[in-house]
């Protein structure tokens, strides 16, 4: 009975039920008296009202029979609408605060609607624009909890829509109705879109006819701002849903009983699956099962498990299996068979026991599903992230550090929280969490970006901001503003990076007092473990130090990463006036100190005796320190202050591209069906593959050897670590320091796990934009363009110098723009500048050019589109000024001989003729 009432209410929403093409209408009916309908009366006779709530607005739909002519619509004694000649075709009353507020009427034969609004005790006419504005005010006052897409394959009860299922004509009729506060804008089945509402239209209900899991007929009801209902019909044809007419829809319902789908019967052995006829589907939290689905054109008529027959169709021409779901193949397996017959269940259940497979019931399957869901479920705390069930990756974009979290295989995040406060939870509908980006400010999570995904390829992004007390959801625009604020805040905290402290890599602070340890005595030996200073034997210039001068904090290069040998050491020179000592550093007490008369070789490095000793005499301690005797005067490098290294700008699409690459790699690993045992977390994998960034949470900075150009007199210096396995000079060679900042390169001998080898392939950056121009914005790995030619030092490949006019590029020829060359035919051509590897991965340390004002010509003409919006490559390389376009110079033309000027008397005959004609015309 409930279903009949529901179906009747839906069908009553059609205005086509009031009058059709059967020749029965108010004008065609003879002897029918006009009636007056009162909206306050509770009539149930020939005319009545039906209450409908759609998109947050409540309507009273006027319904009447085909033999009823309504010529007047009233509210008590107040007339709303009246027409003596043409009867009412359809109409509705819009209610607000449990009372009539507005109304619209459509007369027979006139498609234009008439709108009315209640003003006091009277009803006045209203324009369509004003009616829509009033209707929008009512909708805005209604609290909308969600706007969702309806997946007709999900037929379980949930908080967004109601589901009614009944058998009709041998098929399953399912009705979907959105609940109050939830708006449906799109309808689809699995991954195939059926209908998408445009503009302000919303879907009010959907009726679908199923045979097994196959959706055959669909009827979609929608409503617009005018309150007018419309319906659209679709039919399943060749794996698509095509629109059909109402007549074909009604005829298809009658033919459902005799419906037959042509297919090829096949047999399935769950221990030996033929992937040419079947494909596999992933398990989800809602359905934690291993799915076997026949390809299009096939249907399972016989099911085996080795030698045991599990199912055999008694009528292979009609009855078969559409899908096979296997739950927990290792412990107490249960199989669910989705059949295409036997309404309304369409399912059969089998359980594996000691004696073999036996039939079972649905309650046992529900217990198994709950058990598997408990195994898959995990939670995410934004301030306490565990890598047991989650992949954790620390990333950096410009100066902003954040963390990307994704669930591991066979794990589903059902709740995201901050302690006891819940930020998001799983609501069903297969809308699961696929990725989360957590932004930390002042040591705690302050901004969270959650990506929720359903079965159809669509994403629902949720942004949550930490307030003073609670977390609140924000829009995408507010999220972008918060990101800009965090980037600006992070830039203020970072000190400018100079050449001296470019090798620190987030090491402990300098100075003897910064580490909390007492200063070392002059005769103390320095160890090789931890971040120690250089050994005494490595710097001969200390002997020429002025006696009595206190030991000053050494440069940043004295703090080397642990277990990294260093070959060349720059002697500490005089105090640089451009780099004054930090006033916060503690002053070390001055003690008289004399130079050592003889220098002992370092006990750690006996190989020093093999190196040639310098024969230059030692200079007495002068007031000013001379240059090092180990380096000629001509090779002395004078330090100059350099501007801070510019940081690359914040790229909002960086995490999107990184997430897309990870999603594609994960999908490929699932398709190959290879089981990869991951003993290490995703964090340890990224340490070996991604470039490290100082200060990034969840990571430890990798030590990088200092870089210093080689000199002819001192090409090598012994390493500091005596435990180093090899002391060959080739293993400690450091390539010359480049004038550009480069990304850290992954060592060639570092083995990568299979999962990261697939993850860090060449990414498809055009996955979302589908623009080929975006492909060059993200370069490949820097190690791909590394010079791997054999040299004198096999342990560390030699790299060629990058000078200002010799750059490592992706092409064999890098030229300045405008250079002329000849092509294969000998014709001179003008070469264009190609995008080099340095342009993609490095940043120039040159000062930024000053932008000048825009120059226009005298007529006020602005630049063209290319000048106004130059391409990105030109923005990075140069700053162009707008200049008025130069007018093309006109070539001199040969002057023509001037014609002789006619005398004035030559025009007298013409003037007289004109006067005569004018006189004649005037007389006539």
Curated annotation (Swiss-Prot):
Comp. bias intervals (Basic residues): 879-901
Domain of life the protein comes from: Eukaryota
Basic and acidic residues bias (residue ranges): 522-532, 573-588, 653-673, 737-747, 770-783, 816-825, 868-878
Membrane-related topology note: Lipid-anchor; GPI-anchor
GPI-anchor amidated aspartate-type lipidated residues: 904
Biased composition (Acidic residues): 857-867
Signal peptide feature range: 1-19
GO cellular component term, pick one: plasma membrane
Keywords: Cell membrane, Glycoprotein, GPI-anchor, Lipoprotein, Membrane, Repeat, Signal, Sporozoite
Record's protein name: 104 kDa microneme/rhoptry antigen
Location(s) in or outside the cell: Cell membrane
Bias (Low complexity) ranges: 592-617, 724-736
UniProt-annotated stretches for the region Disordered: 490-907
Propeptide cleavage-removed residue intervals: 905-924
């Amino acid at each position: 009975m409930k279903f009949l009432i529901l179906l009747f209410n839906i069908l009553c929403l059609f205005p086509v039920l009031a009058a059709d093409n059967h020749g029965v209408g108010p004008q065609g009916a003879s002897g029918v008296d006009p009636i007056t309908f009162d909206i306050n009366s509770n009539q149930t006779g020939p005319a009545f009202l039906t209450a409908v709530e759609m998109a947050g607005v409540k309507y009273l739909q006027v319904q009447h029979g085909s033999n009823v002519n309504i010529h007047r619509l009233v509210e008590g004694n107040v007339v709303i609408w009246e027409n003596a000649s043409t009867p009412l075709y359809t109409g509705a009353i819009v209610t607000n605060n449990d009372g009539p507020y507005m109304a619209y009427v459509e007369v027979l034969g006139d498609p234009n609607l008439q709108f009315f609004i209640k003003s006091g005790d009277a009803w006045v006419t209203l324009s369509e624009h004003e009616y829509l504005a009033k209707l929008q005010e009512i909708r805005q006052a209604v609290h909308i909890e969600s706007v969702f897409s309806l997946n007709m394959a999900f037929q379980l009860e949930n908080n967004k829509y109601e589901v009614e299922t009944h058998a009709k004509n041998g098929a399953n009729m399912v009705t979907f109705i959105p609940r109050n506060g939830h708006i449906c804008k799109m309808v689809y089945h699995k991954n195939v879109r059926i209908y998408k509402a445009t503009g302000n239209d919303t879907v009010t209900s959907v009726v679908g006819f199923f045979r097994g899991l196959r959706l055959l007929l669909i009827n979609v009801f929608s409503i617009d701002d005018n309150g007018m209902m419309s319906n659209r019909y679709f039919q399943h044809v060749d794996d698509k849903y095509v629109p059909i007419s109402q007549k074909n829809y009604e005829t298809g319902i009658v033919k459902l009983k005799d419906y037959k789908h042509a297919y090829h019967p096949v047999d399935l052995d769950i221990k030996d699956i033929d992937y040419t006829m079947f494909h596999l589907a992933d398990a989800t939290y809602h359905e934690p099962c291993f799915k076997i689905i026949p390809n299009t054109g096939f249907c399972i008529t016989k099911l085996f498990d080795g030698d045991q027959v599990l199912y055999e169709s008694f009528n292979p021409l009609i009855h078969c299996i559409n899908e096979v779901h296997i739950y927990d193949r290792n412990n107490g397996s249960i199989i669910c068979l989705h059949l295409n017959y036997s309404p309304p269940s369409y399912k059969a259940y089998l359980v594996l026991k000691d004696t073999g497979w036996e039939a079972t019931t649905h309650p046992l399957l529900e217990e198994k599903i709950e058990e598997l869901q408990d195994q898959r479920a995990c939670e995410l705390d934004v301030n306490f992230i565990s890598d047991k069930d989650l992949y954790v990756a620390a990333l950096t974009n410009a100066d902003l550090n954040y963390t990307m979290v994704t669930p591991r295989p066979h794990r589903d995040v059902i709740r995201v929280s901050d302690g006891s406060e819940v930020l998001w939870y799983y609501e069903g509908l297969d809308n699961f969490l696929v990725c989360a980006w957590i932004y930390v400010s002042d040591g705690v999570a302050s901004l969270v970006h959650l990506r929720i995904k359903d079965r159809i390829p669509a994403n629902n992004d949720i942004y949550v901001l930490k307030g003073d007390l609670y977390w609140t959801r924000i829009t995408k625009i507010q999220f972008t503003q918060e990101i800009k604020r965090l980037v600006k805040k992070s830039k203020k905290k970072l000190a400018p990076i100079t050449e001296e402290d470019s090798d620190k890599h987030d090491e402990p602070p300098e100075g003897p007092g910064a580490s909390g340890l007492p200063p070392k005595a002059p005769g103390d030996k320095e160890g090789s473990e931890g971040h120690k200073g250089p050994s005494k034997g490595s710097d001969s210039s200390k002997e020429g130090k002025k006696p009595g001068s206190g030991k000053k904090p050494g440069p940043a290069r004295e703090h080397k990463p642990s277990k990294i040998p260093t070959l060349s050491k720059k002697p500490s020179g005089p105090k640089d006036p451009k780099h004054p000592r930090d006033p916060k550093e503690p002053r070390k007490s001055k003690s008289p100190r004399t130079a050592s008369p003889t220098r002992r070789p370092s006990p750690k490095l006996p190989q020093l005796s093999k190196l040639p000793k310098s024969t230059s005499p030692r200079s007495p301690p002068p007031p000013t320190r001379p240059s090092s005797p180990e380096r000629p005067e001509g090779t002395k490098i004078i330090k100059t202050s350099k501007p801070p290294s510019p940081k690359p700008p914040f790229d909002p699409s960086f995490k999107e591209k990184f997430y897309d690459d990870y999603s594609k790699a994960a999908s490929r690993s699932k398709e190959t069906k290879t089981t990869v045992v991951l003993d290490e977390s995703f964090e340890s994998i990224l340490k070996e593959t991604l470039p490290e960034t100082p200060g990034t949470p969840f990571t430890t900075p990798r030590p990088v050897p200092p870089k210093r150009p080689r000199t002819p007199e001192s090409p090598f210096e012994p390493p500091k670590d005596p435990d180093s396995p090899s002391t060959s000079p080739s293993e400690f060679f450091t390539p010359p320091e480049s004038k550009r900042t480069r990304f850290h390169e992954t060592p060639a001998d570092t083995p990568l796990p299979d999962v990261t080898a697939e993850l860090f392939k060449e990414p498809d950056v055009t996955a979302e934009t589908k623009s080929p121009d975006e492909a060059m914005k993200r370069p490949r790995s820097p190690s791909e363009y590394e010079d791997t030619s054999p040299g004198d030092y096999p342990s560390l490949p030699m790299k060629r110098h990058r000078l200002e006019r010799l750059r490592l590029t992706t092409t064999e020829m890098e030229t300045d723009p405008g250079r002329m060359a000849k092509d294969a035919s000998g014709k001179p051509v003008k070469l264009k500048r190609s995008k080099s590897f340095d342009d993609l991965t490095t940043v120039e340390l040159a000062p930024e050019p000053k932008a000048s004002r825009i120059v226009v010509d005298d007529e006020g003409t602005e630049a063209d589109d290319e000048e106004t919006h130059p391409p990105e490559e030109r923005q990075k390389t140069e700053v162009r000024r707008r200049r008025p376009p130069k007018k093309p110079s006109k070539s001199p033309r040969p002057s023509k001989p001037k014609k002789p000027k006619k005398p004035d008397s030559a025009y007298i005959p013409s003037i007289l003729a004109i006067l005569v004609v004018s006189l004649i015309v005037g007389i006539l």
